[in-house]
Amino acid sequence: MDHLHSSTAELNLLWGSLILEELTRHGVMHLCMAPGSRSTPLTLAAAAQDKLTRHLHFDERGLGFLALGLAKASQAPVAIITTSGTAVANLYPAIVEASLTHVPLIILSGDRPWELIGCGANQAIEQLGIFGGYARQLNLPTPDLRIGPEVLLSALDEQLANLDRPLHINCMYPEPLYPSEHRFDQFDSYLSRLGQWQDTQVPYLSVANASLSAFPPRDAMMRFVHGKGVIVAGTLTEAETPTELITLSQKLGWPLLTDAQSQLRQHPGAIGHIDQLLLNPRARALLDQAERVLVFGGRLLSKRLISYLAEKDWHSYWQVLPHQERLDPSHSNKQLWLGRAGDVCALEWPRSSEANWAASLISLNQSVEQDFIHHIDGGEFGEAQVIRAIAASHTAEQQLFIGNSLPVRLYDMFAPIGCCAASTYTNRGASGIDGLIATACGVARHSGRPTTLILGDLSALHDLNSLALARDCQSPLVIVVLNNDGGNIFNLLPVPTEELRSDFYRLSHGLEFGYGAAMFGLPYDRAEDMEAFIDAYQAALEHPGASVIEVTVAQDQASNQIRRMAEWIRSR
């Protein structure tokens, strides 16, 4: 009986080791782990696996977002190990975000064997399909010598090949879970069925790279560029070489309108202030002359830009996406092309017959920037002023993660022009305020580049225990908390009464973050004016680790400034 138990534990461990080895052969570099007993075969295998960088955290929700950040920054799949029960369910928000933005996360969940599900066994829930349509599913049986290792590996390979969204691999392990020794000598005959696999570094089942692309033919491009057009840059990653859009804009002679998530929002060759320019009568009249639009990416932030695209009767509407999906809530009649933005830009585009038709947009864009310099940079201390200062100081070697709700909208509206911008990250698939600290930690950990996270106070409270992840960062990670004491984005929405806004939407809390930073041993500073913020920010960028800067502002400062700037630009 003891030998049987030992064999069970060792076979569990062998399967766990085979799984992790195969993941490394599919490009997995990072493994995020939470403690638990039912995932012991995977945990022990991970401890012995020297090809993976291991990241440990006590909270599975934060762990999932850490993996998301690592995958975003590395442009490679990241694996997550959890035990059974609600530990798996806590990954759900991160998996939703990853699915909507095509980030490959691989969940390895330990589970009870099937005979212990639905019978009152401890920490046992129905884990199969727990992520619904947000993840592909592979349900592994309990380890069994009658199931050859080649069956296990080929099943893994079929799911892992060409992975562009989350994959849930559910691993059922019977007890005992802890082997007396970590040797696989007794399985030599079993493993011999793998042949040369043990002496190579490639997957057991090699699947061809499935690259789905559909580019416009030359004659279609000739017809498309014949007229007045605009180019719109939506959400783009650095891997899509978004700077090629600048070259295309210059070649066609069409203006490039940029979103906060395009990596081009601050580029001097683009019309970055499009959200505010659409308020200006002269700019809007000029833009209304456009007949054709070429959109790269989707998930636009600016409601004004979204409305502009939706309301016009376009002669031709083209959209370029790296994946086949619908990214247009207005459901416009259009032609969808598939491919990387940079690859489509590199095609032999002819020059437009109406090149430079909207050249005056450049001077209008610069005029808006001068307004921002005068009214925001030279005005009262506030959230937009801080965001502009951060964005203006960044270099191409740095990274900027912008939190949801008000911060990302302030960046989209007011970011400065003419700067060498940092690599920009957001979580705008589901646009939640959860997991932002953890995701930024993942981005910072992979690259080791100086990283700034800008987020609101409610977002920071939502993910406060992820400061434990920040504590382990070895490169500068500056967490800037814009504390306006509640959800003040609701100041911009038509809530019927101020009493309702205060009691049911804004949720003032009266908290400050110094004690939270102290709890996790992080350097902390508080800024109530621009001079104090600049001093604190420069010091934080020189600190070899994470630090917290709290910016305290009045509840209505940002919303009032947004309204004042809108009135000013309308009247110009």
Swiss-Prot record:
Needed cofactors: Mg(2+); Mn(2+); thiamine diphosphate
Coiled coil: none
Reaction(s) catalysed (UniProt annotation): isochorismate + 2-oxoglutarate + H(+) = 5-enolpyruvoyl-6-hydroxy-2-succinyl-cyclohex-3-ene-1-carboxylate + CO2
EC number: 2.2.1.9
GO molecular-function terms, A-Z: 2-succinyl-5-enolpyruvyl-6-hydroxy-3-cyclohexene-1-carboxylic-acid synthase activity; magnesium ion binding; manganese ion binding; thiamine pyrophosphate binding
Group of enzyme by EC: transferase
Cystine pairs: none
Superkingdom: Bacteria
UniProt KW Metal-binding keyword: yes
Keyword Transcription regulation: no
SUPFAM superfamilies referenced in this protein's UniProt entry, alphabetically: Thiamin diphosphate-binding fold (THDP-binding)
GO BP annotations listed: menaquinone biosynthetic process
Cofactor: how bound: Binds 1 thiamine pyrophosphate per subunit.
Pathway annotation: Quinol/quinone metabolism; 1,4-dihydroxy-2-naphthoate biosynthesis; 1,4-dihydroxy-2-naphthoate from chorismate: step 2/7; Quinol/quinone metabolism; menaquinone biosynthesis
Keyword tags: Magnesium, Manganese, Menaquinone biosynthesis, Metal-binding, Thiamine pyrophosphate, Transferase
Assembly and oligomerization: Homodimer.
Homology family: Belongs to the TPP enzyme family. MenD subfamily.
PANTHER family per the UniProt record, alphabetical: 2-SUCCINYL-5-ENOLPYRUVYL-6-HYDROXY-3-CYCLOHEXENE-1-CARBOXYLATE SYNTHASE, PROTEIN PHYLLO, CHLOROPLASTIC
Task performed by this protein: Catalyzes the thiamine diphosphate-dependent decarboxylation of 2-oxoglutarate and the subsequent addition of the resulting succinic semialdehyde-thiamine pyrophosphate anion to isochorismate to yield 2-succinyl-5-enolpyruvyl-6-hydroxy-3-cyclohexene-1-carboxylate (SEPHCHC).
Name this protein carries in UniProt: 2-succinyl-5-enolpyruvyl-6-hydroxy-3-cyclohexene-1-carboxylate synthase
Originating organism: Shewanella amazonensis (strain ATCC BAA-1098 / SB2B)
Lineage: Bacteria, Pseudomonadati, Pseudomonadota, Gammaproteobacteria, Alteromonadales
Name of the coding gene: menD
